[in-house]
Amino acid sequence: MTTPRSDSAGGAVTIKNYPHAMDIFRRLDGLEALGMMQRGEVPKTPITRWMNFSLETVERGHVVFAMLPHEDLYNMIGSVHGGIITTLMDNALGSAVQSVLPAGRVATTMDLHTRFHRPVTAATGKVFADARVVHAGRRTATSEAHLVAANGTVYATGSSTLIILEDKPA
């Protein structure tokens, strides 16, 4: 897991070099950085780790995150809280955009919409937030996602507009 890898500038990239996951986006393009996260070569982002999301698919402009729903995530009516679903979708939507960005550029959410089609419960099983980039410009990008179960049932859909920033180390 700490096997050195080479970044685009020829420098070694290991977990020890990057105590915080955000640091990798300063040196690597988004697709390479997300691929390293998927393979466990660099740490997950704090929210992904805390929410126990798994990064299932990483391709240019396409990312899939998964989550196994459980009762600890329920709201008062007995389904997974909408904020949890929205967080999973936001993670996928933003990562899809990040996957098309060069090193030193980051994207953050400006606008986020989630439409809930049916409740998610523990009985639903693993759900997948499948996100794709619709447009990536110089300053903004848009992405769309579907939250689906393994059987293909759609539980939510969403879209996001993100601002693209030049990341400058503090």
Predicted regions and their residues:
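Terminal targeting signals and extreme-terminal segments of soluble enzymes
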Residues: 1-170
